């Protein structure tokens, strides 16, 4: 399939546990569909058209609390689930580090800004930044609540994957 083929779709996935989400864009970057983790079965109807799925990588850090590690282990399961869905459908699944796609959209907080924020406050600000960017790019997307930040991330990750594919920066894509 050529990039200009209007049937090509791009899937972006934030494999978060409670706030995870996904987004599907067409070859022009227009919104096709999006949803929270619990609505993942809607993705199946598009699998034949999806060219590339871009999935946010999950990291477990040595300084994580037990609660954080448990949450991250569930995200790792979701990451593996999405890779299985994509692999089973013959869709190329490309991992992307959170800092990489967020840098592309100018959403990374600088270290000095992070230190000024209270613990937990940085997560809320990051979520609001993602929502604002996604709302600006796709005003018709249902992104009404802060808990929709995973959907916003999914859409932004899909756009990142679409742009990378367009620039031929994914090997073998």
Where are these regions (language model features)?
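Phosphate- and other anionic-substrate recognition elements at nucleic-acid/protein interfaces
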Residues: 1-173
